[in-house]
Amino acid sequence: MTSKAIYPGTFDPMTNGHLDLVTRASLMFDHVILAIAASPSKKPLFSLDERVALATQVTSHLDNVEVLGFSELMAHFAAHQNANILVRGLRAVSDFEYELQLANMNRHLMPTLESVFLMPSEEWSFISSSLVKEVARHGGDIAPFLPDVVTQALMAKLAAA
């Protein structure tokens, strides 16, 4: 039996913390879907197509990782992909309560869907996409926190705004 996991998120933009988690998930599971949520309510800076393209570039060295966009409920997406594992990152205790609620709701909607929580490597434990965007907007150096192609795309996007 092969294992298929989904690592969902908005990834606006994808950070080195995200890359750390998807890389580690790719070592744990036979197939990993990096599922990029449309998330229009979050008003993403990058379009869904842009986020999918960037994530595809960033993960191209991971042979068992597939990048897909989605706009449906996660449990429905997981069922359509024949996946029964969700990979989620926990940066801090403050993430746990929200993630617990999500895991319980997903299990209610799809009883065979299990959530697996990974802690980021220490060097990425304080990074979030929103924090990186805020630092970039104020002229801070974001290069250490993002893959190079994402840094270039973010700087170009902010310059065009």
UniProtKB/Swiss-Prot annotation:
Signal peptide: none annotated. It is an enzyme of class 2 (transferase). The keyword Transferase applies. GO terms for molecular function: ATP binding; pantetheine-phosphate adenylyltransferase activity. It is found in: Cytoplasm. ATP binds at T10, F11, H18, G89, L90, R91, E99, W124, S125, F126, I127, S128, S129, S130. The record marks H18 as: Transition state stabilizer. Its EC number is 2.7.7.3. Pfam families: CTP_transf_like (PF01467). It catalyses: (R)-4'-phosphopantetheine + ATP + H(+) = 3'-dephospho-CoA + diphosphate. Pathway: Cofactor biosynthesis; coenzyme A biosynthesis; CoA from (R)-pantothenate: step 4/5. Substrate binds at T10, K42, M74, R88. Its cofactor is Mg(2+). Gene3D superfamilies: HUPs (3.40.50.620). Homohexamer. Reversibly transfers an adenylyl group from ATP to 4'-phosphopantetheine, yielding dephospho-CoA (dPCoA) and pyrophosphate. This is Phosphopantetheine adenylyltransferase. It comes from Serratia marcescens. The lineage of its organism: Bacteria, Pseudomonadati, Pseudomonadota, Gammaproteobacteria, Enterobacterales. The gene is coaD.
